[in-house]
Structure formats: structure tokens, C-alpha cells
Amino acid sequence: MPFPSPKNQVPLLGLVSLFGASFSALAQPAQPEASLTPAASPSATPIFFADQTLAHLKQLRQAALASDYAFKQVAHLANNIGPRLTGSVQAAKAVEYVADEVKALGCDVQLEKVMVPHWVRGVETAELTQFPGQAAGTTQKIVLCALGGSVSTPPEGINADTVCVRDFEELKALPREKVNGKIVLFNHSFDKKIAAQGHGGEAYGQAVVYRSDGPVAAAKLGAAACLIRSVGGADYRIPHTGQTNYKDGVPKIPAAAVTAEDADLIAYLAAQGETRMHLVLTPQTLPDVESANVIADIKGSEHPEQVVIVSGHLDSWDLGTGAIDDGAGVAVAMETAHLVRQLHLKPKRTIRVIAWMNEENGSRGSKQYAKDHASEFANHFAVNETDGGADHPIGLNLKAKPEVKEIFEPVAKILQEIGAGTLNLSEHIGADIEPMEKAGVPAFSPMQDSRFYFNYHHTPADTLDKIVPRELQENAAVVAVAAYAVANAEQSLPR
């Protein structure tokens, strides 16, 4: 999952902005008690949320905290279906499952077809075969995983010296002959200190560029392969996978992520002298396959053509079981529909649940949706994507006009009861809803405690046990309350 941009991150003890319905009137200078001419009446502050809507939001919050529906959904996706890499049989099964579940809620369900990539992991091994201080006849195993989309080595592998750099600047400073034919390691650390302060997204944003762009930079100087230090905070020698991006006109070289511990090992030895590696990666890129976004609507009672989207992505990486990334987001979106039906609420605008396909390695699902629905974006009232795990939410990220933050204050007060009343204006919310963000559609997502998320993100440890049921309920409450609030708003949100 691409995480929100660094400026989206706020400290865990973020402050809730203060807002009063009559702030414009309070800002007026005091007037004398008597005046020869009557003072003009201040214009009424627009009402966005009727009292009945606010009452329904409180009901939704409480119902979400009492519901186990979302947990049952993510449990089925993670445990019964398992890893859902785009193009896999598990991904296809997940599409069928989610469609059946939201159909059972009484939603109008469509499977919108999309052709998606089919990349599969193969053998992935590495060992240091020559290094300073080596005992005769020994090697050192390196723990790694291929990056998504990586090309393969020859079946017998590559034998090459390693070159370690911390960043792109160090690589560019090297003459081509120092890189040509070698295995380049980008040893750029994920900043655990700022992640521990609640800025996990910022730490991720600083490091992920080496995963996405490192192999191309190395290939331009003739490297035989590229390794990157895993982008995340995992200990215990666990690698983080993720997509890398090749470019036309630049040779495609094998690419993998090594664990933080192995990156340190290679760098330590390479600093002492020649360090040689045998690397075998045998992934394959197979022909594209047909898949689908799951679209499920609860039709609006007054403005059915106006749409409020709640969403998560259904595909996952293949190392873990895709519980936090992003089974949780799909389950939270499904829970919104479940709660609205359970409480017999009638949203004025259509609430649309979307389970996106192929966020992790291509975003084909969201691109196809944008292509098919671009003419309707003017009637897309607001959009959500939940793709940051399921840790405790402290509020809402909003990508919208600044005045929308003030409009949302009554919603924030209701969410403050569960410690989720912070409102934060963000530059970006989610990869799948980015086309709608760019079209000016107001967007929102839970602002979550991100201290631990990147310890498990894109690793074999992305499993169901990482989800705390109560915190998943809190995320469901945040999304359901925010979605229903805008679905029943008395006026359009400013764009």
C-alpha cells in the first residue's frame, strides 16, 4: 500500500481544531446597544448536519463498537482465503466472496471487470560466497525476497561483487566501472524513531523511493542486480516486499529486498573488502488475467445519483495473509453497509462500497474505475479509502477545502467519544481514490496510530493476529460515521 504523504502524519496526541456553529457571528466587533439605524442581520451559518443525522451518527458509532461483522470478514479473507496477490486463485475467490457477502446485505452489486497483471514469486536465495575474514569452505546466508514485478536471474543465478550505497547521491558519485556488473545494495534505513512517535507514514515515504526507483538507478550504471534494505520496521530478520517500477529504455535487472539485519551485514563486510554474492531469483510475469472491482450500492433515498464511496483494496502481497493490508480496509467498508442496513437507516445519497483489485502492483482496478466513471465524478460526493491497517484511529484525514475541516467538527465531536476526534487536512488520502482526489472530490480516511503498522507491512507477519478486534471496531465506527454524515449532509461540500 502507498501510504499518505508525510505531511499527512500528525503526532499521536494531535489537537482537535475548535469550531463553533456561530463563529462568524462571534468574530463580529461589538455594536452599541442603541443605533440610529438597525444593524444588518448576520447571515445564518449554513447547517450541514440535521439533528436527526447527528443522532443517527451516534447510533452508528455505538453499533460499530458492538459489532463483530468486520472482524469476521477480515478473518475469512486472511485465514480462509489467504494471500490474495493479483492474478491468483485466492484473489479470484476473494472477489466472489465479497460480492456474495454484500449481496446478502441487500446491496446492488456489480463486478466491474479489469485486466490485471499476474506476477508470481519463485525461488529466492542468496549467500555471500567471498568476504573478509571468511572461514575456509563457508558461506553466509542472506535473507531476502523478490520485489514485486522483478525479473529473474538466470536459473543458475548471478555471481557478482556487492557495492553498498546509502542513497541515490552516493550511487551517482561512483564511476560506472565501480558499478558495472555488480550487485548494488541501497542501505537506506527506515527511521524507527519517527515511526515510534506516530509518524510511520513519513518514515515510509523517506525510504520507499529506493524500492520503487533504486533498480532503475542501478541499472543505468550497468548493475547486474539491485538489493534494497527492507522498507519497514520489522525485527527478527523478516524482509518486506513491495512493488518496484521499471522504465522503458532502461535494462530490467533482478531486484530484491534484504532484511535490515542482512543489509547491515553486507555493508559491514563490504566496507572491509571485496564481498561477493550468489543470487538466485526466479519470479515470472505471466499473461494478464481478468479480475474485477466489487461495487456494492445502497441507493440514496433523495439523491441516488450522488455517491459516497467507502473502500479498501482486496488484493494483497503473497508473503503474509493480507490482514492489515488490506483485508481490514475492505472489512471496514463492508461494515459501513452492514451497519446502515442493521439500523434501517436511509441515506439521502448512495453509499457505495468498493473492494478494489490490484492496488499493490499496478492500481489497474482504480484506473479502470476512473476510466469508466470519469463522467460521473461531478456526482461523486465524497470518497474514502482505508489502507493503513487497523490500529487505533485518532481521527480523520481530510483532503478537501480548508472549510471542510470546520464543517466536520460536529462529526469530530461524536468521534471524540472513542478518542478519534482529531481532524487533519492532508495532501493525499489513498492510491485507489487518487483519480477522484485529483478531480476535486473531497476525500477522507481514518488517521491511525502508525507506530507499529510498518513492522508488519508487506511481510510474512501480516496476519490476523495483528488486528485488535476493538481497534478494528473503532476504525469501522470512524468510517461509518463519516460516510453517513456526508451521505446525509444538507448541502454539498465545497470543492
Feature roles, as predicted:
Residues 36, 42-53, 75, 79-196:
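Noncatalytic luminal/extracellular "stalk/propeptide" segments of secretory-pathway proteins
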Residues 47-88, 114, 238-243, 315, ...:
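N-terminal capping segment at the start of a domain
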Residues 54-56, 129-132, 143-176, 243-323, ...:
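Soluble metallo-hydrolase cores and metallopeptidase-like ectodomains found primarily
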Residues 57-65, 79-89, 160-165, 174, ...:
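Second-shell loop/turn segments in exported
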Residues 65, 103, 133, 155, ...:
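Metal-dependent peptidase/peptidase-like ectodomains
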Residues 72, 338-364:
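Short helix-loop-beta-strand segments that form the rim/entrance of peptidase-like active sites
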Residues 88, 140-254, 321, 422:
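Extracellular/luminal Protease-associated
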Residues 338, 342, 349, 454-495:
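His/Asp/Glu-rich mid-to-C-terminal helical/loop segments that flank catalytic regions of hydrolases
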